[in-house]
């Protein structure tokens, strides 16, 4: 199975996001990308929508519930939110939704900054492996992978999807 083209998915996501925001009568959402791939997707979505507002970025490393098991990611960077969260309509963007734990961590962090009016979740891919009841409002595509497979977004220019096989060589 070949992987979809991220640029095509983002174009369709922009159409779907515009319609979603219009239905909800949201006119000036604030975009927030989850590092790293979510930031790239958020930048591309903003470009497709002609939105030139500042982009917020989240690094959820300290908010993850598996922090004590997996340790700290070697490239932790501070979150940057160049706008107030309180009362804002947010578009939270991630590249790959798998378990839902990254989104849960992102929501926890956002609520530490204030109470948004709403949060719209936009994801490039859903791997249909959810452990938590989290679903995107706007989605590029759903992929079903074998348990030993993952997909990674590479970029930022060009954005590309890469399949990764986590199975030990002896298991193949």
Curated annotation (Swiss-Prot):
Disulfide bonds: none annotated. The keyword Lipid metabolism does not apply. This is Bifunctional protein PyrR. InterPro entries: PRibTrfase_dom, PRTase-like, PyrR, PyrR_bifunctional. It is an enzyme of class 2 (transferase). It comes from the Bacteria. Keywords: Glycosyltransferase, Transcription, Transcription regulation, Transferase. GO terms for molecular function: uracil phosphoribosyltransferase activity. SUPFAM superfamilies: PRTase-like. Regulates the transcription of the pyrimidine nucleotide (pyr) operon in response to exogenous pyrimidines. Also displays a weak uracil phosphoribosyltransferase activity which is not physiologically significant. It catalyses: UMP + diphosphate = 5-phospho-alpha-D-ribose 1-diphosphate + uracil. The gene is pyrR. GO terms for biological process: regulation of DNA-templated transcription. A motif (PRPP-binding) lies at residues 90-102. HAMAP family: PyrR. The keyword Transcription regulation applies. It comes from Pseudomonas entomophila (strain L48). Its EC number is 2.4.2.9. It holds the Pfam family Pribosyltran. Belongs to the purine/pyrimidine phosphoribosyltransferase family. PyrR subfamily.
């Amino acid at each position: 199975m070949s992987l979809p083209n991220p640029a095509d998915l983002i174009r369709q996501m922009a159409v779907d996001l515009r319609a979603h925001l219009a239905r909800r009568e949201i006119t000036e959402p604030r975009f927030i990308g989850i590092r790293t791939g979510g930031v790239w997707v958020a930048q591309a979505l903003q470009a497709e929508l002609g939105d030139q507002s500042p982009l917020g970025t989240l690094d959820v490393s300290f908010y993850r519930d598996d922090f004590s098991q997996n340790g700290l990611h070697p490239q932790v960077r501070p979150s940057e939110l160049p706008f107030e969260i309180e009362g804002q309509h947010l578009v939270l963007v991630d590249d790959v939704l798998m378990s839902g734990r990254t989104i849960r961590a992102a929501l926890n962090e956002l609520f530490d900054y204030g109470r948004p009016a709403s949060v719209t979740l936009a994801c490039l891919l859903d791997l249909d492996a959810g452990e938590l009841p989290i679903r995107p409002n706007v989605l590029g595509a759903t992929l079903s992978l074998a348990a030993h497979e993952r997909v990674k977004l590479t970029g930022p220019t060009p954005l590309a999807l890469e399949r990764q096989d986590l199975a030990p060589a002896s298991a193949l």
